[in-house]
Regions:
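Substrate-binding cleft of carbohydrate-active enzyme catalytic domains
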Residues: 131-200
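Contiguous, structured surface segment used for ligand recognition
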Residues: 1-133
Length: 200
């Protein structure tokens, strides 16, 4: 199994889990709000790697959901920590918080990239060594990046479990009243920066 970053513990189990066309993603009700975002990231990953379209719904924490992928909180775990368990019956991701759930989702997406719709049974437990893992992007040198491209950067960072994007900007930001700084550029606006922040 190929993961980046490498999880702390990977234990192969017996059997395989076959993703199916009538599969669904079941969210723990305690994940209201951001849980939809995590489920949509997973839904998009499933579609990209297998061509299948999974529905998203809510379920009861701890209940067995045969054939489903369950995303739930486990408040006994630390912040950003997760367990991903793939069995023949179901896939379950338990995170200590929303970030942990998201990192479990990204690990599952990396598994699907390698194995497609037939996943080996496995138990993966992981947590980051550092609470902040970032990327510093110099937005002022060379071509000015668009908002859509910066969102792609954020998506790629999330895939590799980086959690902080720092932008260095000078003349590529639309400073009010200082048009001479950005006159010949296509600068980022304050609204676009806020949109990127909300997206991240």
């Amino acid at each position: 199994m190929k993961f980046l970053p490498k999880p702390k513990e990977v234990k192969l189990l017996t059997g395989e889990h076959a993703l199916c066309y009538d599969g669904r993603i079941v969210l723990d009700g305690r994940l209201l709000g951001n849980g939809d975002t995590y489920a949509k990231v997973l839904q998009k990953g499933i579609k990209k790697e297998t061509g299948m379209q999974y529905d998203i719904g809510y379920g009861v924490p701890g209940r067995k959901e045969t054939g489903a992928i369950v995303l739930e909180l486990d408040e006994t775990r630390k912040s950003q920590q997760y367990v991903l368990q793939v069995t023949e019956e179901e896939i379950r991701i338990q995170g200590g918080d929303g970030a942990g759930v998201l990192y479990g989702v990204q690990t599952l997406c990396q598994m699907m990239h390698e194995y497609g719709a037939l996943l080996p049974a496995v138990r993966i437990e992981d947590e980051p060594d550092l609470p902040v893992r970032g990327y510093y992007l110099d937005e002022t040198r060379g071509r000015v990046l668009t908002l859509s491209y910066l969102k792609q950067v954020a998506d790629r960072m999330a895939y590799y479990k980086l959690n902080q994007l720092q932008l260095y900007v000078e003349h590529t930001y639309l400073f009010s009243g200082l048009s001479e700084m950005w006159r010949d550029e296509t600068p980022l606006t304050a609204e676009e920066i806020r949109e990127l922040d909300a997206y991240c």
